[in-house]
């Protein structure tokens, strides 16, 4: 298997071995990828998917790794990072923006603004990729990815291209169909509304101002860790439980925004997960509320 993957490297595909994924995650934590590839186009992506399928090798796809915790043992098999696939095309006449999965959702919202198209303002400060935003149904400030998705193009694990309509994506709170199917998002088309460019820009700047004021952007983090339980707010519960500012190793529940766990220096994924579990256990005991993680947690424990 190693020989086959390295042969792909000779063909010009960027593929590496035993690379620490902490280099790519927003938390600056995570163990190594057994193999790591950065496909530049659909042809390379298809070759990689077919190679791992033929050899029965595990396949993991990540985007900008902004809402992701990778355990300290890393990930076996092949990890694909799609950030080199980042084309964005705005069509003012059709009021759409189509973006590759590896494009940043921030850049996609800015492209919409430049084309005087409204609907993606909420995404102006979300640090993830388009693929990640679709996968997680990312949202902020009353906006959700599902509100503006027109269609999603994917590559199935069998190596077939397929397009889903909005309704076929089965969006829910931080959920989409591709979480169940394992399909790889390769692009998304957003259906937007014509608007005033300067009003759109002002709204984006307003949301970014709120983000800077309320979120601990000065530290590495994976953003909001927990889903909001029905009838409750996570931050106030954490504060009432006395856990704001709680630190395990280098992971700390942010003093600026309870519910954000930041890397204040030298944190490991285990530190993050231990703090998450402590918060979940305490909130269950104090409030009888089961906190579910919003952040995606993957990989294996360190031996």
UniProtKB/Swiss-Prot annotation:
<dbReference type="GO" id="GO:0005829">
    <property type="term" value="C:cytosol"/>
</dbReference>
<keyword id="KW-0133">Cell shape</keyword>
<dbReference type="GO" id="GO:0051301">
    <property type="term" value="P:cell division"/>
</dbReference>
<keyword id="KW-0131">Cell cycle</keyword>
<keyword id="KW-0274">FAD</keyword>
<keyword id="KW-0961">Cell wall biogenesis/degradation</keyword>
<feature type="active site">
    <location>
        <position position="174"/>
    </location>
</feature>
<dbReference type="InterPro" id="IPR006094">
    <property type="entry name" value="Oxid_FAD_bind_N"/>
</dbReference>
<comment type="similarity">
    <text>Belongs to the MurB family.</text>
</comment>
<dbReference type="InterPro" id="IPR016169">
    <property type="entry name" value="FAD-bd_PCMH_sub2"/>
</dbReference>
<dbReference type="GO" id="GO:0009252">
    <property type="term" value="P:peptidoglycan biosynthetic process"/>
</dbReference>
<keyword id="KW-0963">Cytoplasm</keyword>
<dbReference type="GO" id="GO:0008762">
    <property type="term" value="F:UDP-N-acetylmuramate dehydrogenase activity"/>
</dbReference>
<protein>
    <recommendedName>
        <fullName>UDP-N-acetylenolpyruvoylglucosamine reductase</fullName>
        <ecNumber>1.3.1.98</ecNumber>
    </recommendedName>
</protein>
<dbReference type="InterPro" id="IPR003170">
    <property type="entry name" value="MurB"/>
</dbReference>
<comment type="function">
    <text>Cell wall formation.</text>
</comment>
<dbReference type="Pfam" id="PF02873">
    <property type="entry name" value="MurB_C"/>
</dbReference>
<dbReference type="InterPro" id="IPR011601">
    <property type="entry name" value="MurB_C"/>
</dbReference>
<feature type="domain" description="FAD-binding PCMH-type">
    <location>
        <begin position="28"/>
        <end position="195"/>
    </location>
</feature>
<comment type="pathway">
    <text>Cell wall biogenesis; peptidoglycan biosynthesis.</text>
</comment>
<feature type="active site">
    <location>
        <position position="294"/>
    </location>
</feature>
<dbReference type="GO" id="GO:0071555">
    <property type="term" value="P:cell wall organization"/>
</dbReference>
<feature type="active site" description="Proton donor">
    <location>
        <position position="224"/>
    </location>
</feature>
<dbReference type="GO" id="GO:0071949">
    <property type="term" value="F:FAD binding"/>
</dbReference>
<keyword id="KW-0560">Oxidoreductase</keyword>
<keyword id="KW-0521">NADP</keyword>
<dbReference type="InterPro" id="IPR016166">
    <property type="entry name" value="FAD-bd_PCMH"/>
</dbReference>
<dbReference type="InterPro" id="IPR016167">
    <property type="entry name" value="FAD-bd_PCMH_sub1"/>
</dbReference>
<dbReference type="Pfam" id="PF01565">
    <property type="entry name" value="FAD_binding_4"/>
</dbReference>
<dbReference type="InterPro" id="IPR036635">
    <property type="entry name" value="MurB_C_sf"/>
</dbReference>
<keyword id="KW-0573">Peptidoglycan synthesis</keyword>
<keyword id="KW-0285">Flavoprotein</keyword>
<dbReference type="InterPro" id="IPR036318">
    <property type="entry name" value="FAD-bd_PCMH-like_sf"/>
</dbReference>
<keyword id="KW-0132">Cell division</keyword>
<dbReference type="GO" id="GO:0008360">
    <property type="term" value="P:regulation of cell shape"/>
</dbReference>
